Design a protein with these regions (language model features):
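Negatively charged, low-complexity tracts enriched in Asp/Glu with abundant Ser/Thr
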Residues: 1-12, 20
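Short intrinsically disordered terminal tails
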Residues: 1-4, 127-135
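Generic alpha-helical hydrophobic packing signal
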Residues: 10-12, 40-44, 133
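Acidic, low-complexity, intrinsically disordered interaction modules
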Residues: 18-127
C-alpha cells in the first residue's frame, strides 16, 4: 500500500514493505515488521515499524508510522543527552544499558534522517499530523 499526503504544498509519499513477523521485545511480544519508505521530492529515507496490522499497511497505518518516526526524532531532539532521555521515558531504571543505548541511537537516527530528507520543521509537521489525522 502507498499513500501520499500534502503538507504545505509538499507531497510526502509513504510506502511500506512487509518484513514478516518479528519479536523485537521478546517472544511474547509478536509484531508484524515493516520497512516504511518516506519520499519527498525524489529523496527517500526508510525506517523500521512494528505493529499488529497485517500486510499491506493501509493509509492510516502508514500515516501513524510516520507520526511515530517523527515523535522518536522529537524525543531525541528534546533531550539534553542520553541520560536526560532515559529519565524522561523511564529508562533510568532500565537494567539493560545496551538496549537503552540502542533506543537512544534509534531516536537520533530518526531525527537525522528527517532533517537530511527535507527542511520541513519536525515539530510543525508532527503537530499537523496529530491535528489532521487525530493521532
Amino acid at each position: 500500500m502507498a499513500t501520499t499526503i500534502k503538507y504545505q504544498g509538499t507531497e510526502i509519499k509513504l510506502t511500506s514493505k512487509y518484513q514478516g513477523v518479528a519479536h523485537p521485545w521478546g517472544e511474547k511480544w509478536e509484531k508484524n515488521h515493516y520497512r516504511v519508505f518516506v519520499t519527498i521530492n525524489g529523496a527517500k529515507v526508510q525506517f523500521e515499524y512494528y505493529c499488529n496490522d497485517v500486510s499491506p499497511l493501509k493509509a492510516d497505518a502508514l500515516i501513524d508510522a510516520l507520526y511515530c518516526f517523527l515523535s522518536d526524532g522529537i524525543a531525541y531532539r528534546n533531550a539534553k543527552d542520553k541520560y536526560d532521555f532515559a529519565c524522561e521515558f523511564g529508562y533510568d531504571r532500565y537494567e539493560d544499558r545496551k538496549r537503552l543505548s540502542d533506543i537512544w541511537k534509534g531516536c537520533m537516527s530518526a531525527y537525522d534522517k528527517w532533517t537530511s530528507l527535507c527542511d520541513i520543521d519536525i515539530y510543525e509537521i508532527t503537530n499537523w499530523l496529530q491535528e489532521t489525522y487525530n493521532l
